[in-house]
């Protein structure tokens, strides 16, 4: 008896097809969408929501994002992804590391259900904030989306960029 298991990239269930009985069954377990961690940077004005607020709260829904490019990034975030927390305007520095604990869901602060939020939890503060000036002058960070699309509030990071910021902040 030949049994084939098909895992669909976007599907959350595994489908099993048995050629002998021509039957299809759907398993009850959840399958991961991907096996690798992704890395992100989120920006917040400290007067609105600072790193200290996330540490105090433990976790928060990252709401209020109303930029189409940032929405694409929020939709791509998955549980376990690592997130650099950047305080903009006054601090202008990466100050901590958070983790995605809940992937994209409808933003409760939006009238349009197309806008999404993710849930983040505070993980690790950086011992030394990594300033925008440090990022701009570090050759290994020269291609960061933060530098090319400075007004974007949610941006992807490469693993190398993430690791370099961690090293600079140690």
Model region roles, listed by residue range:
Residues 53, 78, 93-94, 111-113:
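Short glycine/proline-enriched turns and hinge-like loops at secondary-structure junctions
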Residues 63-69, 102-109, 139:
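Short acidic (Asp/Glu) patches
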Residues 32-47, 107-170:
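Contiguous surface segments at macromolecular interaction interfaces
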Residues 93-103:
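Short beta-strand-centered aromatic/proline hotspots
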Residues 86-92:
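Short, charged beta-turn/beta-strand-edge "cap" motif at the junction between a beta-strand
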Residues 25, 29-79, 169-170:
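Compositionally biased, charged N-terminal/linker segments
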Residues 1-34:
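N-terminal, intrinsically disordered, basic low-complexity segments enriched in Arg/Pro/Ser/Thr
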């Amino acid at each position: 008896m030949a049994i084939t298991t098909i895992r669909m990239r976007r599907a959350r269930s595994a489908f099993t097809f048995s050629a002998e009985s021509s039957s299809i069954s759907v398993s009850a377990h959840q399958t991961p969408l991907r096996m690798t961690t992704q890395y992100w940077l989120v920006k917040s004005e400290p007067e609105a929501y600072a790193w200290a607020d996330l540490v105090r709260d433990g976790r928060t829904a990252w709401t209020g994002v109303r930029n189409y490019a940032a929405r694409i990034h929020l939709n791509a975030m998955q549980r376990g992804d690592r997130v650099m927390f950047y305080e903009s305007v006054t601090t202008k520095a990466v100050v901590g590391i958070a983790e995605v604990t809940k992937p994209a869901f409808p933003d409760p602060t939006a009238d349009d259900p197309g806008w999404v939020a993710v849930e983040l939890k505070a993980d690790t503060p950086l011992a030394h904030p990594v300033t925008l000036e440090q990022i701009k002058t570090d050759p290994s960070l020269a291609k960061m989306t933060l530098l090319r699309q400075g007004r974007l509030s949610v941006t992807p990071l490469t693993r190398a960029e993430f690791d370099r910021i961690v090293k600079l902040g140690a």
